[in-house]
Amino acid sequence: MRLLVTALTTVLLAACTAIEPAPQAPQAQPLVPMPLNPAMTEIFDGKALRVILCGTSSPLPDPGRAKACTIVVVGDKAYVIDTGPESWEQLQRMQFPGSRIAGVFITHFHSDHIGDLGEFRMQTMVAGRRQMLPVHGPRGVANLVTGFNLAYEEDARLRLAHHGESVIDLASSPLIAKEFGKAFVGGLDAEEIILRDGDLTVTAFEVDHDPIRPAVGYRFDWKGRSVVISGDTGLSANFTANAKGADVLVTESLAPNLIGMAQQQMNAAGNLRAAKIMADIPDYHISPLDAAKTANEAGVKLLVYTHHIPSAQVNLPPYFAGVAAIRPANTWVIGWDGLRVDLPAGSTDVQQGELLPKPN
């Protein structure tokens, strides 16, 4: 598949000298321990509601980004929203403590949102998780959890045989399904409080990803601060209503102009299957401009774009055409894997930082 913009960089190698030196025996290099990330202590201090992006791409290839994944940190617990392929690797790059993950929330069952669920099962167990990992989701989550448990149960037994019970707790290794949304029947008007934990309330709400049903977003409210994660969605009144007054809205972005160009190129190349997909996807993903309009209507403080389609071109000027005209520059950000947003308790501040460097 040809990318929309192809950057060809020619590197000229210096000519070898006529006489090459004799090869040297390789020198042993000492192992240098990786320094601990001090941010991993700070983010669990209980002073703020925190958001971390751990996957910001889509099924279209982008080597610098994992597929869909967002983390919300509350107190000493972390909650993962979607577990797209490569997302666990990004958490490892951040040195994120897997034992702090207290639950997973699935927005819908496309592969780019669930592909690393098995890795989360295994890696959090190895990191020290000592209770079954809840996986919250709408109708269908039980089948998802059953499948990943079956696929990974032998892995857990093999690791127990090798490392012993001091490392592997076989009884707590499985995922456990937490299904909700009996009223989520595609009317795009339903919401449900699915978790209360101290000062934290998590609400699931229907979104329009038709024909994908059910599909949901999540709202996290804690001590007067709030974060909304839309999942994959188009415009809907229910989406806007549940984003009302949020400090942060994390939502996807599909650039219809660039996807249209991709469709034309694929048709011209005779790749009709890929062209058909490019023609189909704009009708169930929100554009950057429509996301900005939704954020404005809902009174959102910071709009964070993620799940970029196509993510390899996200920094091209046409991608966010029109957004700057309706939303000030300091109220929206192009998300990357490692973006961190802090919402301190008892404050209205919205603070941005990074756990991984922003790509060029």
What are these regions (language model features)?
Residues 1-7:
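Sec-dependent signal peptide recognition
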Residues 12-15:
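C-terminal motif of bacterial Sec signal peptides marking the signal peptidase cleavage site
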Residues 19-20, 216-217, 223-228, 234-338:
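Cap/insert and terminal regions of metallo-dependent hydrolase folds
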